[in-house]
UniProtKB/Swiss-Prot annotation:
Residues holding GTP: 51-56, 251, 257, 279, 345-346, 348, 401
Protein name: Guanine nucleotide-binding protein subunit alpha
Keywords: GTP-binding, Hydrolase, Lipoprotein, Magnesium, Metal-binding, Myristate, Nucleotide-binding, Palmitate, Transducer
Role played: Guanine nucleotide-binding proteins (G proteins) are involved as modulators or transducers in various transmembrane signaling systems. Involved in the mating pathway.
Family classification: Belongs to the G-alpha family. G(q) subfamily.
Taxonomic source organism: Candida albicans (strain WO-1)
Lipid attachment site numbers (N-myristoyl glycine): 2
GO molecular function: G protein-coupled receptor binding; G-protein beta/gamma-subunit complex binding; GTP binding; GTPase activity; metal ion binding
Region annotation Not present in other G-proteins: where it falls in the sequence: 125-197
Region named G4 motif: 341-348
Residues bearing a lipid moiety (S-palmitoyl cysteine): 3
Length: 429
């Protein structure tokens, strides 16, 4: 009899239970790696210039993964919005005169005169609980936004150039300055009116005074709350002292972000820590404290602000400042290997704007069709992608941060991408 060469036999072929054990061990190891990675967590940094909508993105994350807003938050926004709706109408009346727009309520014997007088003599701070609205932070922001003294101070400090790391510091107004400003410019000649009479006055001026609408159409030329028209349309809701802000009210409302806020979310078994840093110049010097161990940067840009100037310096275009800011962050040593997610936000407002204010007036190198929204957005997408001088990926999304339906889709895509990248780093995928 001949003899053949022996062939080694795999133990798995002899013992199927051993094969099952190896498979189970591999699965267990994979699960342990995933668990360790989820414990380590994901750090998402929200950045962008002031009023870009990044805090609205955070609000949408709360709606999706935190069960929405508390009763306290709803009360707070009701107070803040009531103040802003009154002050926004005051701003329109004052700015119309500066822009030499004829107001019906300024004409002799016009039936709208009493409504104008109510608005100009109203003091919203006498009608709310400042502590519920945010205490000192709220009063600080209110004075910064609406005090003529602070507007004049900003004009005097204006350089007309981008100052991305911000040496201006409007946020550090002390309590004496707050009290002085409130007693002088804000409370001057004020009277106590009922909320209903104020709401009626705002409603009449908004609906019937053609000059107010003309002034609103030119609001890119001065500083006005971005949701002022929404406030005016719903003014009777906000006039109700028992009214609790809806989700949409809160998404439309604005409370200035000061410092750096941290919010934790559990998304797909991963711990997400989202850091929202104040975007105005005076806040940016604080950013450096949250640059370490960042998984991804979410940079929010209000594309609709191509024709507006900064609140901090009315000689600087908001879009130009955002471009320089994005450049400094994207190409920073801190984020050399950190993926960037770019939200081109407020596209709904942008679509309406470019039909009235051609993009080429502000960006002469744009050679697309004047009223082609898609072409105009692509212009910005291309220019922002060109800024990247590294090999890291940049993911661009077109967003309307106040639209919960579309943001649910976008944020799901973003969090899925971040989770997948973390799994790849762990060797699980």
């Amino acid at each position: 009899m001949g003899c053949g060469a022996s062939v080694p036999v795999d133990d798995d072929e002899i013992d199927p239970f051993l094969q099952d054990k190896r498979i189970n061990d591999a699965i267990e190891q994979s699960l342990q790696l995933r668990q360790q990675n989820s414990k380590k967590g994901v750090k998402l940094l929200l950045l962008g210039a002031g009023e870009s909508g990044k805090s609205t993105v955070l609000k949408q994350l709360k709606l999706l993964h935190k069960g929405g807003f508390t009763q306290q938050e709803r009360r707070q926004y009701s107070h803040v919005i009531w103040c802003d709706v009154i002050q926004s109408m005051k701003v329109l009346i004052i700015q119309a005169r500066k822009l030499k727009i004829k107001l019906d309520c300024d004409q002799p014997n016009n039936s709208l005169i009493p409504y104008k007088q109510i608005i100009l003599r109203s003091d919203p701070l006498k009608q709310i609980d400042a502590d519920v609205a945010g205490g000192t932070d709220f009063l600080n922001d209110f004075v910064v936004k609406y005090s003529e003294e602070n507007k004049n101070k900003r004009r005097l400090k204006s350089t007309g150039t981008t100052d991305i790391w911000g040496k201006d510091d409007d946020s550090n107004i002390n309590s004496d300055a707050i009290n002085q400003a409130l007693e002088s410019s804000l409370n001057k000649d004020s009277e106590q009116f009922t909320r209903l009479s104020i709401a009626e006055a705002i409603h009449k001026l908004w609906k019937l005074d053609s000059g107010i609408k003309k002034c609103f159409d030119r609001s890119n030329e001065f500083q006005l709350e971005g949701s002022a028209d929404y406030y005016f349309d719903n003014v009777f809701n906000f006039a109700d002292t028992n009214y609790l802000s809806t989700d949409l009210d809160i998404l439309k409302g604005r409370i200035k972000t000061t410092g750096i806020t941290e919010t934790d979310f559990l998304i797909k078994s991963f711990q997400f820590k989202v850091l929202d840093a104040g975007g105005q110049r005076s806040e940016r010097k604080k950013w450096i404290h949250c640059f370490e161990d960042i998984t991804a940067v979410l940079f929010v840009l209000a594309i609709s602000e191509y024709d507006q100037n900064l609140f901090e310096d009315e000689r600087v275009n908001r879009m130009h400042e955002s471009i320089v800011l994005f450049d400094s962050l994207c190409n920073s040593k801190w984020f050399a290997n950190t993926p960037f997610i770019l939200f081109l936000n407020k596209i709904d407002i942008f679509e309406n704007k470019i039909k009235k204010n051609p993009l080429k007036n502000y960006f002469p190198d744009y050679d697309g069709k004047p009223d082609d929204t898609n072409e105009a957005i692509k212009f910005f997408e291309t220019n922002f992608l060109k800024i990247n001088q590294t090999n890291k990926p940049i993911y661009v999304h077109r967003t309307c941060a106040t639209d919960s339906k579309s943001m649910k889709f976008v944020l799901s895509a973003v969090t899925d991408m971040i989770v997948q990248q973390n799994l790849k780093k762990s060797g699980i995928m």
